[in-house]
């Protein structure tokens, strides 16, 4: 598989080889959809980790599109095949490595695996995600869902002859689970190491800092799951995140007494997702549906349409929300829109830090655009915004 990837990359090796100054740089082939011409345009994207600068070349016309320019919003961790990155308001999809050096350095050991938080540990999702981020994983997909008995049987097919099979099925269907696709070098092995032994009691002895030691109870109620092999990882990820474009198991949105929260891309890329989920839970808000989305600009413009011509930061808000993955949450609470908006605090984090220092934006926000979270402003829009993500976009 890896040899095939490197071979495929060689056909797209750029004519722009390593720069004369010999500074390290990584090359990718990226595509951008030009809405005006209705065309997919292909570029070579160069990233220089020494100073965080980027350079772009038009592949078809063989000319420089963007001279080498420092760009602080792109990190080396963002650069992997299939990811969407935002470079000066253009959303680029990374489709291949641009040269064999980049393929060898960044692609040789990258793996994806399934991380599944089981029903007994969903309330500790923030802590588990925090451990995942600190262990060098990138979360590329995330979805809270419920499993039918048929889906549970497909998931546990390898345990069908085990005496505890029925207990497994009953437990995994007893409440919501959170499925994630996670990425890093040697992901399968490293995720199993972070999980600890399958029996939580043994984990507390042999791996006291592991997820199962901290959050599990026994061999079935053991907080989280990870596949053992490449084959099982591929099979299980196909169950939860079908490559055919289907939704997989049903999401958990209730569409009652709800409002919408969106954790913005900058907060995700800065590793704040787990901390924000913990803060929301500790403030006694119910999180009845959670899902990661990669939005295109048209989706964001539609979602933010009410702010167009009203908020001076509208264009920057749109650019931020489509700059990378975001996480949408259905918040449930009595009078949810008002109480959650107050918990988020003023839109400007500087004002929030002076007036409401305990709010989400005061703690996690940076600027009025990169203010960590979006929340519904008007009570009549709470359900509509939740439906936009968990009914329209999810389907």
From Swiss-Prot:
Gene3D superfamilies: 2.30.29.170, Nucleoside diphosphate kinase-like domain (3.30.70.141). Residues 22-110 form the DM10 domain. It comes from the Eukaryota. InterPro entries: DM10_dom, NDK-like_dom, NDK-like_dom_sf, NDPK7, NDPk7A, NDPk7B, Nucleoside_diP_kinase. GO terms for cellular component: axonemal A tubule inner sheath; axonemal microtubule; centrosome; ciliary basal body; cytosol; extracellular region; gamma-tubulin ring complex; nucleoplasm. SMART domains: DM10, NDK. Keywords: Cell projection, Cilium, Cytoplasm, Cytoskeleton, Flagellum, Hydrolase, Kinase, Magnesium, Metal-binding, Nucleus, Transferase. Pfam families: NDK (PF00334), PH_NDK7_N (PF25364). GO terms for molecular function: 3'-5' exonuclease activity; ATP binding; metal ion binding; nucleoside diphosphate kinase activity; protein kinase activity. It is found in: Cytoplasm, Cytoskeleton, Microtubule organizing center, Centrosome; Nucleus; Cytoplasm; Cytoplasm, Cytoskeleton, Spindle. GO terms for biological process: brain development; cellular response to leukemia inhibitory factor; CTP biosynthetic process; determination of left/right symmetry; epithelial cilium movement involved in extracellular fluid movement; flagellated sperm motility; GTP biosynthetic process; intraciliary transport. Its EC number is 3.1.-.-, 2.7.-.-. PANTHER family: NUCLEOSIDE DIPHOSPHATE KINASE 7. Contains 2 putative kinase domains (111-243 and 258-391 AA), the first one is involved in autophosphorylation and the other may be inactive. Component of sperm flagellar doublet microtubules. Component of the gamma-tubulin ring complex. Belongs to the NDK family. This is Nucleoside diphosphate kinase homolog 7. It comes from Mus musculus (Mouse).
